[in-house]
Design a protein with these regions (language model features):
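N-terminal secretory signal peptides and thylakoid transit peptides that target proteins
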Residues: 1-17
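C-terminal segment of N-terminal export signals and the immediately downstream linker at the start
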Residues: 21-36
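Aromatic-rich peripheral "rim/lid" segments of glycoside hydrolase catalytic domains that contact
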Residues: 359-420
Length: 420
């Protein structure tokens, strides 16, 4: 989940968060009807294993060594084995391409060896793995705009070559797939995104004819992006899987997120799930209390943010979202799969989650967060979709960064079991 593409989409999501889009769907394609045997059913994202980088400031475009922050949480072999015992069967591993692309040949070889070791560790724990190339929008140089905004982007060819390299290295591992891009920012039916994706898939297929590849629609991999995706041209790159991400309604899942640029989210907290579990008045009181403790934002900016918060929360509470809301969105993804003859087991909900309230964040009430996670997970399973929870660590996680204890509420919400 990168903030960059999501931020662009959320400019309109605040006012339309409770109105699912519809899309015209074409007839089924026999070429896409094969089911295959996929290892991916219930997964978790393992950010920031290959993220949180040590980039030098501009005008430099390289990274310190090692390029990843030493204090970031990284799963140990024991952590991975415990995850397997919960009932999870795969890991989605986001990989920041920046350090790989900025490195000289010798340094890149070291990084690729590190990635090989991580993939092997996951597989040794009896877990499958999806390696996702996930550019960081906060990076000043090696960011999505410079790499995947179009096939003419300044660093697109370098990015494309890396995708080919990764495909060639990963093909020797069992139970692995490659996802070349995370949350493409182009519009839902963008030809620009179609061209970018096709070029990346071609690079991967030039290195491996058999490695499963994960494809997605535009609009940041939202359901609406998948609904607009024409899978017919992608049949040439089989074997392929499809993916979408689900964070709707953002007013719930992203409340209290400090990385969001929209001022509504920073003080937003105590938004209930379902909406009927709370009230507009209680949530607005919590927002006012949060704003009162903010000594950095001007009073004028607070007033403007509060007015917008009041407006969007009224929409939220008037709509009274519940499990029906989740089902309506995810049902669009199932309708898309059915209309194209694609088995739902090939369509992975690659990210879903919500920020929790803890010592670092003031966000969703934790019982409400658990209800939301359970609703989304159960809705995906009812449609036959595999899923990957965001995230293993940090404020949206299921495992404590330091103690490595699992959150029983999240384990239960995900339909898993606490390992003995």
């Amino acid at each position: 989940m990168t903030g960059w593409s999501r931020r662009r989409l959320l400019r309109t999501a605040l006012s339309t968060a409770l109105v699912p889009a519809t899309a015209a769907l074409s007839s089924a394609s026999p070429a896409l009807a094969a089911t295959g045997e996929w290892r991916f059913r219930r997964g978790v994202n393992a950010w920031p294993w290959f993220a949180l980088t040590r980039e030098f400031p501009a005008p430099r475009t390289d990274y310190d060594w090692p390029p990843f922050q030493s204090q970031r949480p990284v799963p140990t072999p024991d952590d991975l084995r415990r995850l397997r015992r919960t009932g999870l069967d795969f890991v989605r591993l986001p990989v920041d391409p920046g350090p790989f692309l900025a490195a000289d040949a010798a340094t890149r070889a070291k990084l690729l060896a590190m990635l090989d070791d991580a993939v092997a560790a996951v597989i040794d724990a009896d877990l499958g793995i999806i390696v996702n190339v996930q550019a960081n929008g906060a990076t000043h140089y090696w960011n999505p705009d410079r790499m995947v905004s179009s096939t003419a982007a300044p660093e697109f060819e370098a990015y494309r070559a890396l995708v080919g390299t990764l495909a060639g290295r990963l093909q020797r591992f069992p139970s692995v797939a490659l996802e070349p891009v995370n949350e493409p920012p182009q519009s839902c039916s963008s030809n620009v995104w179609s061209n970018v994706q096709a070029a990346l898939l071609a690079a991967a297929r030039a290195s491996s004819q058999t490695l499963p590849l994960v494809v997605t629609g535009g609009c940041g991999s939202m359901v609406s992006g998948l609904a607009a995706l024409d899978p017919e041209p992608l049949a040439a790159f089989e074997p392929i899987l499809f993916t979408f991400h689900f964070y709707e309604p953002y007013l719930f899942s992203h409340q209290g997120a400090p990385w969001m640029r929209e001022p509504v989210y920073r003080a937003l907290n105590n938004v209930p799930w379902p909406a009927s579990a709370g009230s507009l008045e209680r949530t607005l009181a919590s927002v006012r209390a949060r704003m009162a403790g903010d000594t950095e934002t001007s009073e004028a900016d607070k007033q403007a943010a509060y007015a917008e918060t009041e407006r969007v929360l009224k929409v939220y509470f008037d709509a009274r979202p519940d499990r029906w809301f989740v089902d309506k969105y995810i049902g669009q993804a199932r309708d898309w799969a059915d209309s194209h003859g694609i088995a739902p087991t090939r369509v992975i909900m690659g990210e879903f989650g919500a920020l929790r309230t803890d010592a670092r964040y003031v966000a969703a009430p934790n019982p409400d967060r658990a209800r939301y996670i359970a609703d989304v997970r159960q809705s995906a399973e009812a449609s036959g979709f595999p899923w990957a929870f965001w995230d293993l660590f940090d404020g949206m996680g299921m495992m404590d960064d330091k103690t490595r204890s699992l959150d029983p509420a999240m384990v239960d919400a995900l339909g898993l079991r606490m390992p003995e």
